[in-house]
Amino acid sequence: LHAHQAQAMEQERNFIVATGTGSGKTESFLFPMIEDLLSSQKRSTPGVKAILIYPLNALATDQMHRIARLLFRDLGDPGLTLGRFTGQVQSSAKRRDEEAVLQRMPVFRENFGEDAKVPEGWLLSRKEMLDTPPDILITNYAMLEHILLLPRNQDLLKGANIHWMVLDEIHTYTGAQAIEVAFLIRKLKASLGIKSGTVRCVGTSASLDPSR
């Protein structure tokens, strides 16, 4: 482990990881988050337990593959489920079709092998996630607002028991956008009845100005 990863794992409070690209900032929150979610009490509770918010769809997609590799390959599928809920995800596509698309992607083949099956815990369509919300939800702030506003999406957070909230590339939230995201998070907490101090909030950045 890098020093910043070890320090993050020891934290039991909110923290920000500001370190260079390729230095393992994603693992800084993933390792303690997964360890926490695998505790017997949290594991037995259905619903979304962690929300990972990215500013861009491309980042959300890239991180989905990294987290899937860690969960389903490196950790041998410990029983947590993963889903990405963005505008690029099909609403009700057949899982077989979505699996075929995923299996053709070079990043999937690189992570899992040429003939690997898609892990069952990797939820691929919005319908799958609405029917059985994932433990770890990847999204962006615009889609999170849709989830909270649109009745057809609200089942995604039904019964949610949020323990972790991660904002990646936190330095990108400035000015009016930062205010919008702050209010969105407050709205999320209010709608789910989240009490202060019950959620670990993490911010990550590879470009954070030291003066900030």
Q: Where do the protein language model's features map onto the residues?
A:
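Pre-Walker A (Motif I) flank of P-loop NTPase domains
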Residues: 12-17, 46-50, 133-135, 200
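Structural recognition of the conserved hydrophobic beta-strand(s) that form the central parallel beta-sheet
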Residues: 52-53, 136-140, 166, 199-205
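Inter-Walker segment of RecA-like/P-loop motor cores
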Residues: 75-149
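Conserved Walker A/P-loop ATP-binding site and its immediately adjacent core
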Residues: 47-72, 83-94, 143-146, 177, ...
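Motif I (Walker A/P-loop) of helicase-class P-loop NTPases
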Residues: 25-37, 64, 181-185
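Conserved pre-motif I regulatory segment
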Residues: 1-18, 27-35
